[in-house]
């Protein structure tokens, strides 16, 4: 089995995901490398953070540099010198993020290229073929990521189209004799009955894992957690569960507690570029004047390169001067913070002390 469930603590799960390019310990956080890189970091620096798997984007790599360039190197892994597993988004998120320039039909989605404005058309089959050429360890089906809010009628129509695309994705994946994994994406907006319909049909088709899409798109937190609790009960226990796009530390804790195994999000890297840094007691804005003369490390509990070698004062200086080194050091730290958090969550599940860990976490981060 590609997924091994090793231990539970309530609904939380400790597991291992066995990919062609390596093993991923779950719960796992996957940093986002849209264009084949985690912004500002080398592959070795990403690996040093404790990252075991990264996410890249089918749609954007298809447009630039193009499959012909990546295939010259043999695979996306070799192109970016990453030795671990890679999961690729199918392009479904671009159906959401490029909504002003796209047209949805049952056949697929037409887009205006964000690079030069020329028209491109992406079908479920084409998305699977691109991911096959990239040699993604985990391939995602093509779907529509539904915006919030939306009407029940629109969401039902969208779910039906996505289910059609799921069947076509499954068929094309199988005809390519792909040895990697294929994950489905459960949609349905904030409507439990439509989530039920989506999950039931996808489970009937059969996939290696099940992602939860259409969350963290602007809905209230209580709505996200409500839908998350509902869906986790629907997914077979022997399959990995992947929450797409949600990534604040408290979201990770709540979702792990509900039974989620995998996460991706741009928050740690994007926040790092904007000078917002995660520390044991919460978050800090490193540009604030209070850090100008602060000679202490960014986080005394952190073992990352940044915290072992530089002070808050120096990071404050780099941020004020807009030095690229500051962005790199911030990113190294934030990514390590997230991977340390996942390591601590896995250890808490292993020792059946997750609730105690979460209680301590919330008490600690409220100090700032």
From Swiss-Prot:
Catalyzes the base-exchange of a guanine (G) residue with the queuine precursor 7-aminomethyl-7-deazaguanine (PreQ1) at position 34 (anticodon wobble position) in tRNAs with GU(N) anticodons (tRNA-Asp, -Asn, -His and -Tyr). Catalysis occurs through a double-displacement mechanism. The nucleophile active site attacks the C1' of nucleotide 34 to detach the guanine base from the RNA, forming a covalent enzyme-RNA intermediate. The proton acceptor active site deprotonates the incoming PreQ1, allowing a nucleophilic attack on the C1' of the ribose to form the product. Binds 1 zinc ion per subunit. This is Queuine tRNA-ribosyltransferase. PANTHER family: QUEUINE TRNA-RIBOSYLTRANSFERASE (PTHR46499:SF1). Residues 269-273 are annotated as: RNA binding. It comes from Blochmanniella pennsylvanica (strain BPEN). Zn(2+) binds at residues 302, 304, 307, 333. The gene is tgt. One of its GO terms (molecular function) is tRNA-guanosine(34) queuine transglycosylase activity. Its EC number is 2.4.2.29. Pathway: tRNA modification; tRNA-queuosine biosynthesis. Belongs to the queuine tRNA-ribosyltransferase family.
């Amino acid at each position: 089995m590609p997924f091994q469930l090793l231990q539970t603590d309530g609904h939380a799960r400790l597991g291992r995901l066995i990919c062609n390019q390596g093993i991923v310990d779950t719960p796992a956080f996957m940093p986002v490398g849209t264009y084949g890189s985690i912004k500002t970091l080398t592959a070795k620096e990403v690996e040093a953070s404790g990252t075991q798997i990264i996410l890249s984007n089918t749609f954007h790599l298809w447009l630039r540099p193009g499959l012909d360039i990546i295939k010259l190197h043999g695979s996306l892994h070799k192109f970016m010198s990453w030795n671990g597993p890679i999961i690729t988004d199918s392009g479904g998120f671009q159906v959401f993020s490029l909504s002003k320039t796209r047209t949805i039909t049952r056949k697929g989605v037409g887009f205006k290229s964000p690079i030069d404005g020329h028209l491109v058309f992406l079908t479920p089959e084409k998305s699977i073929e691109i991911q096959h050429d990239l040699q993604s360890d985990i391939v995602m089906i093509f779907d529509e990521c539904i915006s919030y809010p939306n009407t029940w009628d629109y969401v039902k129509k969208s779910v039906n189209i996505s289910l059609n695309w799921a069947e076509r994705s499954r068929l094309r994946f199988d005809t390519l004799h792909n040895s990697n994994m294929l994950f489905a994406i459960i949609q349905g907006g904030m409507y439990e009955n439509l989530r039920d319909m989506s999950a039931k049909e996808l489970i009937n088709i059969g996939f290696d894992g099940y992602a939860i899409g259409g969350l963290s798109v602007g809905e209230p937190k209580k709505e996200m957690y409500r839908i998350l609790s509902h869906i986790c009960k629907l997914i077979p226990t022997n399959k990995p569960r992947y929450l797409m796009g949600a990534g604040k530390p408290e979201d990770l804790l709540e979702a792990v507690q509900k039974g989620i195994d995998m996460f991706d999000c741009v928050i740690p890297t994007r926040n790092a570029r904007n000078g917002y840094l995660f520390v044991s007691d919460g978050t800090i804005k490193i540009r604030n004047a209070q850090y100008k003369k602060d000679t202490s490390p960014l986080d005394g509990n952190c073992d990352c390169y940044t915290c072992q070698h530089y002070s808050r004062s120096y990071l404050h200086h780099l941020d004020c001067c807009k030095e690229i080194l500051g962005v790199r050091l911030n990113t190294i730290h934030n990514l390590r913070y997230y991977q340390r958090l996942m390591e601590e969550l896995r250890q808490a599940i292993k020792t059946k002390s997750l609730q105690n860990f979460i209680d301590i976490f919330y008490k600690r981060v409220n100090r700032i």
